[in-house]
Amino acid sequence: MAADEEPDSPSGALQTAAEEEETKTFKDLGVTDVLCEACDQLGWAKPTKIQIEAIPLALQGRDIIGLAETGSGKTGAFALPILNALLETPQRLFALVLTPTRELAFQISEQFEALGSSIGVQCAVIVGGIDSMSQSLALAKKPHIVIATPGRLIDHLENTKGFNLRALKYLVMDEADRILNMDFETEVDKILKVIPRDRKTFLFSATMTKKVQKLQRAALKNPVKCAVSSKYQTVEKLQQYYLFIPSKFKDTYLVYILNELAGNSFMIFCSTCNNTQRTALLLRNLGFTAIPLHGQMSQSKRLGSLNKFKAKARSILLATDVASRGLDIPHVDVVVNFDIPTHSKDYIHRVGRTARAGRSGKAITFVTQYDVELFQRIEHLIGKKLPVFPTQDEEVMMLTERVNEAQRFARMELREHGEKKKRKREDAGDDDDKEGAIGVRNKVAGGKMKKRKGR
């Protein structure tokens, strides 16, 4: 066969298809010029795999089921077709996006507003934890896009005079598997009954569970499936490790890793709100720029933590699983599972915070004597044996005394904070990220810890 005919071979054809995918632009997908310019301004040089799959079909008016790994550009895959359609037929209350969490709702709103800034797109975020009256006023202005959690949206549909979605053209269910796992099925059913049947529906999910399949049958008409990753797959450029350590030395090993990989951004997952707060205080006492994000914080403080981390004002975000899905934090270099997830699928979503959209990243999971069975389930789920993260145990043990001292002061601060909350429920200050307790931190032997350069 001649050299110029080589693409006719199976391997040559695959290579050509991959090269074509690499060179595709948003314009090639059918996105209008004004939105292509918005993509350029956001630094979206080229579409991701899920965008290449989903956008042309969505622009043809098809219902879409999008299955893609976390961090694959799912928001752009549904936002661009919706904005494209809005440009052609401008209308208020044009699209509804349902999400499982408040944080994800704000993230999606930011992307819609950024992409649609030049065409004057107006969004309303309708979530719990925020005053209903201000949301009612926002809905009265009839925004183009409503981004909502199901529970609060039902509240407004039932109680906000004059608000309805009878003219809705697009419905998006993002992180649909999680919406259903959080027992929002009843609310979703109610919403489906009060919106037009003649609409376009996009369902995006990390996994195709039985509940999602049931929802697909109820909500979508002749949908096209766009899948760019297999079930429970972790992204290719993610380096995954584990550390088998005694439970009592978890804090010490965490400090060692933060020093060894200094200069990176970290997302550290803890199992409880209390442990998240305690570990954040411990790390601050040792001079690290750590900030917590958990469900016991107010909505404004949670968004404050998230924004400081996104702006790189803080390099370490400690979070419960409330932050493990859907949040747009593109610069996480290392994920640490400080507490191993109880549900194996949560491992996929946690480590999906790094190695996003083609970048590389590390994930390190702490395994104690109590976690062996959970860890084996994770390895079985992802279909691979993880290597051990290399450590120098002698160097780790040298940190023990100072870490123990920082632990004591962290516990003291937690107690003081708890007593203060009892005395004064309304706390106007930003206790979750103030640089206070300076006296306590200065007592930690040696002050700030010397950090090594990252590997």
Curated annotation (Swiss-Prot):
<keyword id="KW-0507">mRNA processing</keyword>
<comment type="function">
    <text>Involved in apoptosis. May have a role in rRNA processing and mRNA splicing. Associates with pre-rRNA precursors.</text>
</comment>
<protein>
    <recommendedName>
        <fullName>Probable ATP-dependent RNA helicase DDX47</fullName>
        <ecNumber>3.6.4.13</ecNumber>
    </recommendedName>
</protein>
<feature type="short sequence motif" description="Q motif">
    <location>
        <begin position="24"/>
        <end position="52"/>
    </location>
</feature>
<dbReference type="InterPro" id="IPR001650">
    <property type="entry name" value="Helicase_C-like"/>
</dbReference>
<keyword id="KW-0539">Nucleus</keyword>
<dbReference type="InterPro" id="IPR027417">
    <property type="entry name" value="P-loop_NTPase"/>
</dbReference>
<feature type="region of interest" description="Disordered">
    <location>
        <begin position="412"/>
        <end position="455"/>
    </location>
</feature>
<feature type="domain" description="Helicase ATP-binding">
    <location>
        <begin position="55"/>
        <end position="226"/>
    </location>
</feature>
<dbReference type="GO" id="GO:0008625">
    <property type="term" value="P:extrinsic apoptotic signaling pathway via death domain receptors"/>
</dbReference>
<feature type="binding site">
    <location>
        <begin position="68"/>
        <end position="75"/>
    </location>
    <ligand>
        <name>ATP</name>
    </ligand>
</feature>
<dbReference type="Pfam" id="PF00271">
    <property type="entry name" value="Helicase_C"/>
</dbReference>
<dbReference type="Pfam" id="PF00270">
    <property type="entry name" value="DEAD"/>
</dbReference>
<dbReference type="GO" id="GO:0008380">
    <property type="term" value="P:RNA splicing"/>
</dbReference>
<dbReference type="InterPro" id="IPR000629">
    <property type="entry name" value="RNA-helicase_DEAD-box_CS"/>
</dbReference>
<keyword id="KW-0694">RNA-binding</keyword>
<dbReference type="GO" id="GO:0003723">
    <property type="term" value="F:RNA binding"/>
</dbReference>
<keyword id="KW-0547">Nucleotide-binding</keyword>
<feature type="domain" description="Helicase C-terminal">
    <location>
        <begin position="237"/>
        <end position="397"/>
    </location>
</feature>
<dbReference type="GO" id="GO:0006397">
    <property type="term" value="P:mRNA processing"/>
</dbReference>
<keyword id="KW-0347">Helicase</keyword>
<dbReference type="InterPro" id="IPR014014">
    <property type="entry name" value="RNA_helicase_DEAD_Q_motif"/>
</dbReference>
<dbReference type="InterPro" id="IPR014001">
    <property type="entry name" value="Helicase_ATP-bd"/>
</dbReference>
<dbReference type="GO" id="GO:0003724">
    <property type="term" value="F:RNA helicase activity"/>
</dbReference>
<keyword id="KW-0597">Phosphoprotein</keyword>
<dbReference type="GO" id="GO:0016887">
    <property type="term" value="F:ATP hydrolysis activity"/>
</dbReference>
<feature type="modified residue" description="Phosphoserine">
    <location>
        <position position="9"/>
    </location>
</feature>
<dbReference type="InterPro" id="IPR044765">
    <property type="entry name" value="DDX47/Rrp3_DEADc"/>
</dbReference>
<comment type="subunit">
    <text>Interacts with AGO1 and AGO2. Interacts with GABARAP. Interacts with NOL8; the interaction is RNA-dependent.</text>
</comment>
<keyword id="KW-0378">Hydrolase</keyword>
<comment type="similarity">
    <text>Belongs to the DEAD box helicase family. DDX47/RRP3 subfamily.</text>
</comment>
<keyword id="KW-0067">ATP-binding</keyword>
<feature type="region of interest" description="Disordered">
    <location>
        <begin position="1"/>
        <end position="21"/>
    </location>
</feature>
<keyword id="KW-0698">rRNA processing</keyword>
<keyword id="KW-0053">Apoptosis</keyword>
<dbReference type="InterPro" id="IPR050079">
    <property type="entry name" value="DEAD_box_RNA_helicase"/>
</dbReference>
<feature type="short sequence motif" description="DEAD box">
    <location>
        <begin position="174"/>
        <end position="177"/>
    </location>
</feature>
<dbReference type="InterPro" id="IPR011545">
    <property type="entry name" value="DEAD/DEAH_box_helicase_dom"/>
</dbReference>
<feature type="modified residue" description="Phosphothreonine">
    <location>
        <position position="149"/>
    </location>
</feature>
<keyword id="KW-0007">Acetylation</keyword>
<dbReference type="GO" id="GO:0005524">
    <property type="term" value="F:ATP binding"/>
</dbReference>
<dbReference type="GO" id="GO:0005730">
    <property type="term" value="C:nucleolus"/>
</dbReference>
